[in-house]
Amino acid sequence: MKREQLIQNIEKLKHIMPSYVLEYYQSKLTIPYSLNTLYEYLKEYERFFSWLVDSGVADVDKITDVSLSVLENLTKRDLESFILYLRERPRLNTRSTRYGVSQTTINRTLSALSSLYKYLTEEVENEDGEPYFYRNVMKKVQTKKKSETLASRAENIKGKLFLGDETQGFLDYIDNEYEKTLSNRARSSFFKNKERDLAIIALILASGIRLSEAVNVDLRDLNLITMVVEVTRKGGKRDAVPYAPFAKTYFERYLEVRSQRYKTTAKDTAFFVTLYRDVPSRIDPSSVEKLVAKYSQAFKVRVTPHKLRHTLATRLYAQTNSQVLVSNQLGHASTQVTDLYTHIINEEQKNALDNL
C-alpha cells in the first residue's frame, strides 16, 4: 500500500475511534511504531469495538462513544465470547472461510488489545499522574501459539532460502536473465527500476535487516566505506548493521542513476525512492514485497523479504556457528530465535554428508 493511501486509511479509522485510542495512537507514534503496525492495530480495534457495540456489551450506538469504564469492567467471559465470535462468525457469514479466522489472526487481535490495555493501565497519565484505570483483563486471557517443531519449521522454510551460490545467483538472474522473460513493454518498465530493485534486494540479503528497516534507510544512513547501514530497530532503537561486501556494487550502481532517474533533490533524503507523476517519494513496503515476489518467482520460488532475511541469517550462522553473532546482526535481544537457523544448517550438513 502506498504511503499516501496508508495515511488516508489511518485517518478514516481515527475518525471513528474513542479519544483514548487516539491518545494511544499518538503515544506510539513517538516511539515510533511504524504506520503499517499502527494501521493494523487500528483495524483490530475497529473490529473489537464494533463487536462491543453490536453485542450490547457497550450500551452505545457508535464506536466513538465506547467509554473507558466499558474496558475497565470487561470480564474474562466477555473476552472469551469475543474470541468465539472471531472463530465462528466467518463460518456463519462467508463462504470463503469454512473454519473461522486462524489462530494467528486471533493472536494478532489479542496482541493489539494487550498493547492498548497496557497503555491505559500502566503508561498513560491522567491529571493526577495515574493511569486511567488499573484492572487489565487482558492479563487473564491466554493465547494459543501455533504448535510446530523446529524440524518442521526448518523443513518448511529451507526450500525458500537462497543459500550458498544461490544468493549471488538470484542477483545475477535479475541483472542478466530476467529481462529475457519479458515483453518489450514490460522490459522498458523493468529497466526504469532495475538498479534500485537490485540495491534493495542486495541490502536485505547482505545485512538481514527487516523490510521496515530497509525502506526507512536514508542516504546518510548507508556508508559505502565502512560498509555499515544505520537503521531504526523495533522499539525505536538505532543500530549500526554491517553488510556483506557483495552489496556495495549494487548500491553504487543505483546511486549513479538515482537523482536523474527519480528526479530527486537535496530534500529527498530517502535512500530508496519511487517516482509517481514526476514526484519522488520513499518506496513503501508493499512495493518491495511485490518486486521481491516477482523476481523470486521467476528465479526459483516466490518468497517474501523476510525469507531474504532468513537467508542471510542462515548463511551467517553457517560461516560462524555463533548464535550470538547472528542475533546481533538481526537485532534480536535473545539467541532463542536463532535456533531455527542452527537446525537448517544441521540438515544441510547431514545432506552434504549423505552425498559423500
Curated annotation (Swiss-Prot):
It comes from Lactococcus lactis subsp. lactis (strain IL1403). Site-specific tyrosine recombinase, which acts by catalyzing the cutting and rejoining of the recombining DNA molecules. Essential to convert dimers of the bacterial chromosome into monomers to permit their segregation at cell division. The active site is at residues 210, 234, 306, 309, 332, 341. One of its GO terms (biological process) is cell division. SUPFAM superfamilies: DNA breaking-rejoining enzymes. The gene is xerS. GO terms for cellular component: cytoplasm. Residues 16-121 form the Core-binding (CB) domain. This is Tyrosine recombinase XerS. FtsK is required for recombination. GO terms for molecular function: DNA binding; tyrosine-based site-specific recombinase activity. Keywords: Cell cycle, Cell division, Chromosome partition, Cytoplasm, DNA integration, DNA recombination, DNA-binding. It is found in: Cytoplasm. PANTHER family: PHAGE INTEGRASE-RELATED, TYROSINE RECOMBINASE XERC. It comes from the Bacteria. Residues 169-354 form the Tyr recombinase domain. Its main location: cytoplasm. Belongs to the 'phage' integrase family. XerS subfamily. Pfam families: Phage_int_SAM_1 (PF02899), Phage_integrase (PF00589).
